[in-house]
């Protein structure tokens, strides 16, 4: 698949192995995994970071290669059930952080055309994602602007 704002090809990667059951060596109880997921979320980790920590560190020393196979739930579903879900979806939040950084850079360096273009592309991605999440994760009348992004991220950190 191609990249969104360039003519280059996307990067290919290996596929996840097809498996219906977790490996025998990873026999941790699903409740213990859920507790660890909530604990990591309360420490401020995002869902993707939680998955990597469980893969690398595991629960009680045993790595968890795939949370969904071990618990039959995604990390975000577990967080929803325990009311630890972040206010903004992770991908949208990361794009907003990037747009804020770029906007502040472009305000200081008005001659930087490459980063002006990068800001335009990032804001386009945000608007596209916002239309996807609108109504479910975001308010029905949500429209992106720099001020709204700053306000949302400051409210989330507080």
UniProtKB/Swiss-Prot annotation:
GO terms for biological process: translation. Residues 33-45 have a biased composition (Basic and acidic residues). Pfam families: Ribosomal_S13_N (PF08069), Ribosomal_S15 (PF00312). Keywords: Ribonucleoprotein, Ribosomal protein. It comes from the Archaea. GO terms for molecular function: small ribosomal subunit rRNA binding; structural constituent of ribosome. One of its GO terms (cellular component) is cytosolic small ribosomal subunit. Residues 1-10 have a biased composition (Basic residues). Residues 21-32 have a biased composition (Acidic residues). Residues 1-66 are annotated as: Disordered. The keyword Ribonucleoprotein applies. PROSITE patterns: RIBOSOMAL_S15. Part of the 30S ribosomal subunit. Belongs to the universal ribosomal protein uS15 family. This is Small ribosomal subunit protein uS15. It comes from Haloquadratum walsbyi (strain DSM 16790 / HBSQ001).
């Amino acid at each position: 698949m191609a990249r969104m704002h360039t003519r280059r090809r996307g990067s290919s990667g290996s596929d996840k192995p097809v498996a219906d059951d977790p490996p025998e060596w990873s026999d941790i109880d699903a409740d213990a995994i859920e507790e660890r997921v909530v604990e990591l979320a309360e420490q401020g980790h995002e869902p993707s970071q939680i998955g990597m920590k469980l893969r690398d560190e595991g629960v009680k020393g045993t790595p968890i290669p795939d949370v969904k196979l071990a618990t039959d739930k995604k990390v975000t579903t577990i967080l929803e059930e325990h009311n630890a879900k972040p206010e903004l979806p992770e991908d949208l939040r990361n794009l907003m952080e990037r747009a804020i950084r770029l906007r502040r850079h472009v305000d200081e360096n008005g001659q930087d055309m490459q980063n002006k273009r990068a800001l335009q592309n990032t804001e386009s991605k945000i608007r596209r994602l916002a239309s996807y999440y609108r109504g479910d994760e975001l308010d029905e009348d949500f429209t992106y602007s720099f001020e709204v992004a700053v306000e949302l991220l400051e409210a989330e950190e507080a």
